[in-house]
């Protein structure tokens, strides 16, 4: 009986842990990847600098614990909490 109870506890822990993983696009050319523990927000930011008219906007994607603060050189900033929501 103790063995069965222990097995159920282990299965529950494994299932709960799997339920909290997030997958996000990490770079524009990659397939979605699992985010590190504690980073359950996907983000995508597009920013320009003084060379934007020559090389285009810089796109950064990934996983974060908190959404980055919007800055004046960002063209856009997306933060979301569902899998693969930052293509």
From Swiss-Prot:
Primary location: secreted
Pfam families membership: Toxin_cobra-type
UniProt GO MF annotations: acetylcholine receptor inhibitor activity; ion channel regulator activity; toxin activity
Organism: Bungarus multicinctus (Many-banded krait)
Family per record: Belongs to the three-finger toxin family. Long-chain subfamily. Kappa-neurotoxin sub-subfamily.
UniProt-recorded name of the protein: Kappa-6-bungarotoxin
Role noted for this protein: Postsynaptic neurotoxin that binds and inhibits neuronal nicotinic acetylcholine receptors (nAChR) with high affinity (IC(50)<100 nM). Is a selective, and slowly reversible antagonist of alpha-3/CHRNA3-containing and some alpha-4/CHRNA4-containing AChRs.
Gene Ontology annotations for the cellular component aspect, listed alphabetically: extracellular region
Tissue: Expressed by the venom gland.
UniProt subcellular location: Secreted
Quaternary structure annotation from Swiss-Prot or TrEMBL: Homo- and heterodimer; non-covalently linked.
Disulfide bonds: 24-42, 35-63, 48-52, 67-79, 80-85
SUPFAM superfamilies xref list: Snake toxin-like
Keywords: Acetylcholine receptor inhibiting toxin, Disulfide bond, Ion channel impairing toxin, Neurotoxin, Postsynaptic neurotoxin, Secreted, Signal, Toxin
Signal peptide: 1-21
Lineage: Eukaryota, Metazoa, Chordata, Craniata, Vertebrata
């Amino acid at each position: 009986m103790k063995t069965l109870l222990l097995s159920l506890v282990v299965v529950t822990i494994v299932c709960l842990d799997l339920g909290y993983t997030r997958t996000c696009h990490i770079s524009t050319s990659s397939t979605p990847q699992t985010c590190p523990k504690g980073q359950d927000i996907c983000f995508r930011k597009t920013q320009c600098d003084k060379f934007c008219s020559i090389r285009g906007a810089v796109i950064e994607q990934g996983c974060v614990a908190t959404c980055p603060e919007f800055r004046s050189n960002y063209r856009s900033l997306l933060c979301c909490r569902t899998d693969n929501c930052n293509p």
